[in-house]
Amino acid sequence: METMLLHLHLVRHGQTFFNRYNRLQGWSNSPLTDAGLADADKAAAKLRDIEFAAAYCSDTTRAQVTAQRILDANEAAGHVRPSLVSDMHFREQFYGYFEGQDMSVAWTAAGGPHGAKNYNDIVRKYGLAATRDFLKEADPFHDAESDNEYWHRVEDGFALIADNPRLKDGDVELLY
């Protein structure tokens, strides 16, 4: 297998209603606020002059809207518009039982048994991976993704990019 160098631009969506309300959202499909739409347009303006060979995003509306706005601006600047691949492998972490719950309540439930008061305390004491593992432990149904489950899914998403036969060495891709 030939090794290729691809340039990947990672873009996060702007503010959603769940963000505004301090609610956990991973797989929940909370729409972008007006501020979030403005953030998408700012990202679009900054990326408009980059020629993208491919574009990928999660299958959530917030990611798709952000991606479409960036690709619209890119196309308006004279670039060929790549097809947008929306796939669940690019979703954010799944919070299981805690999806849509107030963040302070969820992170207290996850960190409390480990002597951590909140998300930042968990990260400081145990590292980022522990945030996923502790939340899965605290989920009464254990549906929330563990760190291992999360990375296994995301790696499958990166495999979709790597397996794209149209990409060549040096191409630039966009991931929302």
PLM regions: where:
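Short coil/turn segments at beta-strand junctions that form active-site/ligand-binding loops
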Residues: 6, 51-53, 166-172
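Short glycine/proline- and acidic residue-enriched helix-loop micro-motifs
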Residues: 113-149
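Glycine-rich, flexible loop/turn motifs
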Residues: 20-23, 28, 86, 94, ...
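Active-site-adjacent alpha-helix immediately C-terminal to a catalytic or transition-state-stabilizing loop
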Residues: 64, 72, 155-176
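Loop-to-helix element that buttresses phosphate recognition and phosphoryl-transfer chemistry
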Residues: 15-70, 145-154
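Histidine-centered catalytic micro-motifs
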Residues: 10-16, 176
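Phosphate-coordination/substrate-recognition cap region in phosphate-metabolizing enzymes
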Residues: 3, 44-126
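Extreme N-terminal starter segment of soluble prokaryotic enzymes
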Residues: 2-9
